[in-house]
Amino acid sequence: MAAGVKAAELRELSEEELVTKLREAKAELFNLRVQAATGQLDNNRRLQVIRREIARIYTIMRERELGLSAAPTEVTAG
């Protein structure tokens, strides 16, 4: 995953893509925590970046649930 995904970029994704990103971020966070526990983690900052990315994804999902923002709609040419 890219370091520090912006909220504007995440808002352009569909619900399925957000769920996929969330799953990937959680898996990466788990791996980073294992590395930290075993003393193999090189970049401690990456833990915070991933945690914030997860929080951004949850926030966008909640905004859509409450109707504060809408999921992007597909525009068909024609």
Swiss-Prot record:
Q: Which InterPro entries match?
A: Ribosomal_protein_uL29, Ribosomal_uL29, Ribosomal_uL29_sf
Q: Which PANTHER family does the UniProt entry name for this protein?
A: 60S RIBOSOMAL PROTEIN L35/50S RIBOSOMAL PROTEIN L29, LARGE RIBOSOMAL SUBUNIT PROTEIN UL29C
Q: Which GO terms describe its biological process?
A: translation
Q: Does the keyword Hydrolase apply?
A: no
Q: What HAMAP family would the database entry show? A: Ribosomal_uL29
Classify the source by domain of life: Bacteria
Q: What is this protein called?
A: Large ribosomal subunit protein uL29
Which species is listed as the source?
Salinispora tropica (strain ATCC BAA-916 / DSM 44818 / JCM 13857 / NBRC 105044 / CNB-440)
CC terms in the record's Gene Ontology section? cytosolic large ribosomal subunit
Which gene does this sequence derive from?
rpmC
The entry sums up its family as follows: Belongs to the universal ribosomal protein uL29 family.
Nucleotide-binding in keyword set: no
Q: Which residues form a coiled coil?
A: none
Q: Give GO MF terms, alphabetically.
A: structural constituent of ribosome
Keyword annotations of the record:
Ribonucleoprotein, Ribosomal protein
| Disulfide bridge positions per record | none
Query: For this UniProt entry, which residues form the secretion signal?
Result: none
